[in-house]
């Protein structure tokens, strides 16, 4: 890491465990470029799984999909992948690449497990989905079929972007409250008239509502930003966070005080002030 004064800092090490001093690696990773410039990173690779199994399920209603997720979380299985797509996302993917997805489905869930118990785990997830009223639920341990099912989720971002400009949101809630968040997003979309394609990582409660912008007028942008703030407010009411992956950036700087108290903000400002007193790094962003 290159610091604001030009000094070079190396963090971390080759050991599996290391608690000598503060965890500076995580501090700089999470700083959005406000504390230093990361010029290199060393990663540890994990071996490819020797066996995978994949499942997919569709639901006619949002409520049924949420019941399935609650059942999956309660079942104790720990899939390596647990993703969801709403109807807007399903249709975007199907418009982009014909995959014979059910356009009438309100929710699509895709899960994948690996290891010796992979098929047993996805079979358990299939049962949870069937018990919740899935219109379709199937599993496979064939790698080619699994790759085809996963492709639908991987195409979601490209398919949504192909439709037109969007604001991509990034919010996360406790998994037990994910259903409430999805319901709130659907309500906000209906009330505002802004179409929202929601896709996300159900396994950790992190979703990405994509707000479609019919045009780039100031009025449309203002409406969309107000909708994004409503989603963040709903997220905080569910004990969540306004960002799970993408960071605060510029858009959410003004909303950060809704989540962090004055002490937390002051500590972060003090850290930044100590490392970059002149505000040279990523100006206009931060705390």
Describe the predicted segments one by one.
Residues 1-287:
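Noncatalytic alpha-helical scaffold of FAD-dependent oxidoreductases
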């Amino acid at each position: 890491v290159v610091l604001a004064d030009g000094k070079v800092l190396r963090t971390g090490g080759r050991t599996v465990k290391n608690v000598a001093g503060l965890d500076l690696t995580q501090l700089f990773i999470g700083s959005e470029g406000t504390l230093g410039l990361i010029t290199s990173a060393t990663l540890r690779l994990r071996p490819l799984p020797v066996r995978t199994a994949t499942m997919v399920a569709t639901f006619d209603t949002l409520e049924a999909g949420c019941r399935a997720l609650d059942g999956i979380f309660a079942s104790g299985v720990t899939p390596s992948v647990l993703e969801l797509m709403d109807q807007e996302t399903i249709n975007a993917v199907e418009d982009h690449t014909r995959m014979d997805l059910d356009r009438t489905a309100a929710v699509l869930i895709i899960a994948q497990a690996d290891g010796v118990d992979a098929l047993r785990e996805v079979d358990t997830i299939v049962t949870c989905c069937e018990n919740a009223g899935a219109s379709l639920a199937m599993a496979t341990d064939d790698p080619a079929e699994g790759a085809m099912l996963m492709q639908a989720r991987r195409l979601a971002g490209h398919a949504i972007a192909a439709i037109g400009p969007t604001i991509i949101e990034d919010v996360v809630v406790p998994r037990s409250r994910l259903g409430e968040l999805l319901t709130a997003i659907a309500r906000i979309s209906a009330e505002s008239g802004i179409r929202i394609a929601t896709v996300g990582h159900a396994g950790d409660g992190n979703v990405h509502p994509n707000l479609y912008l019919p045009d780039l007028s100031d009025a449309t942008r203002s409406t969309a930003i107000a909708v994004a703030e409503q989603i963040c407010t709903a997220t905080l009411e569910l004990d969540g966070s306004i960002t799970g992956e993408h960071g605060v950036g510029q858009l959410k700087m003004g909303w950060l005080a809704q989540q962090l108290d004055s002490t937390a903000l002051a500590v972060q400002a003090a850290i930044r002030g100590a490392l970059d007193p002149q505000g040279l790094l990523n100006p206009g962003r931060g705390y």
